[in-house]
Amino acid sequence: MIYDIKDFLKKFFSSRLFVLAAVIIFMFALLAERVFTLQIIKGADYQKNFIMLIKKPLSIEASRGNIYDVNGELLAYNQLAYSVVISDNGSYSSTKEHNRLLNKELNEIINVIKNNGGSIYNDFPVVLNDDGTYSFTFTSETSKKRFLSDVFGKKYDKLEYNKALGFDEANASAQNIIDFLSSDQNECFDISSKYDTQATYDIVVMRYAIKQNRFTKYKTTTIAKDVNDSIVAYVNEHSDTLTGISIEEDTIRKYNYPEYISSLIGYTGKISTDEYNELSKDDDSYTQNDMVGKSGLEQYYESYLRGKNGEKQVYVNNVGKINEVISQKNPVSGNDVYLSIDIKLQEATYKLLEQEIAGIVYSKIKSGEIPISDVYFALINNNVVDLTHFNASDASATEQAIYNSFSGQLQDALSTIDSELESGTSGTASMSEQTLDYFTCVMSVLNDDGLLLSKQIDTSDSTYASWKAGTLSPRDYLKYCISKQWIDITKLDVDQKYADSSEIYTALCSYIKDAMTDNKDFAKIIYKYMVNSGAVTGQQLCLLLFDQGVLDYDDATVSNIANGSISPYAFLMDKINNIEITPAQLALDPCTGSCVITDVKTGQLKALVSYPGYDNNKLANTVDADYYQSLREDKSNPLWNYATQEQTAPGSTFKMVSSTAGLAEGVIDTSSKINCTGIFTEISNQPKCWIYPGAHGMDNVSEALRDSCNVFFYTTGFRLASKDTGSYDDENGMKYIQKYASIYGLDQKSGVEIVEKTPSIATQYPVMAAIGQSNNNFTTISLSRYVTAVASGKLYDYKLMNKIVDADGKTVKQYDSKSTDISGTLTQSQWDAIHQGMRMVVEDLHDVFGGFTGVEVSGKTGTAQQVETRPNHALFVGYAPSSDPEITIATRISSGYSSHNAAAASRNIISYYYNLESLDNLLAVKAEGVNASGSSAITD
């Protein structure tokens, strides 16, 4: 046995197998030693180094501060919400598979979100319009250039004509962008043609957002915010099949009283690149995912409201998933901002102003000054009814009938255009109104689309002059434009090298026909004539209001309209009377207004109203693209702040400035009498008083303010212009008017913390400037500041902020009343004369303030003409109580016909403020109870 073993070992050690075994054992020993060194001896060091490579910081956004009114009523706050998010960290065998599966998954979750009443988070700068076209939403050229650079992956100055794509990258249209990103080009999204237009757009929006996080895949991309329980449940239940999609807790910005306060507060949204670059200069804690104030006080007080972001350190694996949170620094909440605004007064002022405007519209329809056909068409023209739904698969019978009729009219209109372009020889001046409207739209589209190179047109050219004079046909003009190279042929389907002028013109005609076929403005022109001819009836339009959900469906009313028991006229008048259809929706004159109420003792703003308003909840957090587009297309322009941005002549409200100038410079005194004969004959154009052919007779300054006597103030302006030299000098007169208007602050902004236009004092014609005409141009808030100075002798710097309080309740900033004392401009007796005149104005307004007791009011009316084709603007400025003013009010109703209408709205607002009547009682009279007055003629 032993010998056998020895023999075996002898043979083994002497064999080649031994050498092989020895080598294997040696190598295994080396491997064991290496593993021991890596894991035991140096394991901690390698682990540490590995962790440092994948340790990532994540910002925790601070809770934004709240906004309150002066009484602590909550206006803006944060609400806990759930968001659907995605991390693009799936594993795919190829780029093609990645695109296909990710697009499919996004389409699935987007459909779930939409089918359950949600909407996708969309800050993509291209919107899909109702008519299926795309447009950009940029607010600056810089933003657009940066976007194009990002899309095409190169610096903007390197963008050029791309032969493969067929367009110039630097001038890419919104449609070009969607087509490019949807394609299978390098780093594009390869979206299948099986997806319809809306689905393709939604996928592009999401894929582009995901692309922004391509270098930080551990960060999530938001698909939808503030989703409901049904969507949350779906995502959680399908988490095993929805790759990278999950639910996250979030906060969203919410606003109370949105319609009444949106023009002041504004809204928040995701920070843009431009905003990030600007804000980061002063605060490097901003990230490109932060929510910031986009407009209004949210933007102005961003640094106070924002708070301080926290941070957490995390470990992420090689595909970007978070494995562990290793530390966290909690954020610090933002400060709360308290406004000087009383929201209840703000709301009441808005409603009473709206009722006054509705009352004017109601009375003008009733009198026939606004034809009922204009009201019918307004429902189409201002998009109250949705034209794009007329041919939808679920269109109502009424919608289908209107669309069928429209289709025939569209073909007739296109035939008219074809005929004119093919053989028309008559100038536009001899065209029918309808055909002229068609070609006005055609030329507008060519200009907007960039085909007509308007900057290259020689306006001194004789042929161009003939076109402007209406003696040239569209056919001849467009052919001439081609010959002068005023047409951009790169946008036409022609061979740019070899096409002759005839081929270019044929292509241009084809372009026009295609463009008009799908143009919304052109469709509205056709509908206007269909309404006027009865091809679309008032009955049909009234039924559409129910079919499309503009009004709550009511079987009995619908039946009565359909069978003729209720006429369209009676139905619409009832809805206007009850303000179920608002002046803003109709966008007829008048449809806008503003009012500012100020505390005379402190200069604080108690109400600053712009009508109409909008729902800033739909623009905050993520913009509701459809809603935003509807606001942009709304002819009442609700995004415009009519209190701080609209400028008009002040009309006779300016006469306190002229009184001040005349008294201070000694060209009149408190007892001076000027004889009004109804006409002023000292200058060549011989302007008339509003009372002409009547006359006011002898008036002193107080009586002239009461009567709003133009001749008195023409004379004052004339005397100021003649003061220094004894002879009339236009420039000299303007020097004095500008001096005293400036004392009242009418050459500077009020100081309010939102967008405001700078008022401008007239620069010519002192005689006309003295009655508030010439080129005087003021905002409502500048008139408020002016009348507050008249009432108090102080020119205040306005502010909307009352105080700012931190999270612990400590006041960090307090409103400090700042003013300039202007009381020394006049003697007390001169001030008294002006104040007496303003009191007499109100006492003389029997149709407005007759029977008004409880508080004495002083004021001044003003009617300002802007254009002859529209009604005059209605203005009123005043204060109360007359003997010891507490508040001032400045009201403007744009195109409001008569100043009495602005005075009536002011009366009701003052009545509410002093608790003389309840808001319910004031609103109970409805539109028909408003004593709307005035024509388009100036009456004061």
What are these regions (language model features)?
Residues T592, P687-P693, T725-V767:
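Mid-domain, small-residue-enriched loop/turn segments at the edges of structured enzyme/sensor domains
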